[in-house]
Amino acid sequence: MILEACISTIEGLKAAQKFSLDRVEICKDLHLEGLTPSIEIQSLARSLFNGTRYVMIRPHNNGFQYNQMEIKKMKKSIEAAKKNGVHGVVFGVLKKHKIDFKKNEELINVAKDLNLKCTFHKAFDQCQNFEKSLIELSEIGFD
């Protein structure tokens, strides 16, 4: 079993290291269900936590639908995360209550080209058909 925690602070990273967690998901604003963290904390995480590091890629807390400008911003966030030595990224794009294949695939392609793992996040909870959605996520390249 993998022991993972969502972390938004330096103290959280230190605690994750102290308690030998396997993985952290670095984000900010946990009270908003997590947003893309600053470059600074991503960089610090590299030296403070020896385990696997994933970064949340979520530019706003207005649901999980993103326009093309926001997708472009998310791609840049994925590239920045790679420069900070992360192992994977966490994101999810919906179209109403269904998976937005096109936009998720755009993000997956950027991440996979950088050898990053991709995890579909909390947006899954808003999908109408969980079983079908799980199969679809696997088919489009989420790990």
Residue spans for each PLM region:
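Active-site gating/metal-coordination segments in enzymes
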Residues: K75-V90
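Short N-terminal helix-initiation segments at or just after the protein's N-terminus
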Residues: L30-T36, R53, I57-G63, K83-H87
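Active-site mouth loops of central-metabolism enzymes
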Residues: M1-T9, I57-K75, T119-N129
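Active-site-adjacent beta->alpha loops and helix N-cap segments on the catalytic face
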Residues: I10-A15, L30-G51, Q68-K72, K76, ...
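N-terminal entry module detector
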Residues: M1-L32
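Conserved, mostly hydrophobic/aromatic
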Residues: A16, A81, L107, H121
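Hydrophobic faces of well-ordered beta-strands that scaffold small-molecule active sites
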Residues: L3-A5, V24-I26, R53-I57, V89-F91, ...
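Glycine-enriched alpha-helix->loop->beta-strand junction motifs that scaffold or abut catalytic
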Residues: K18-V24, L48-T52, G85-G88, D113-N115, ...
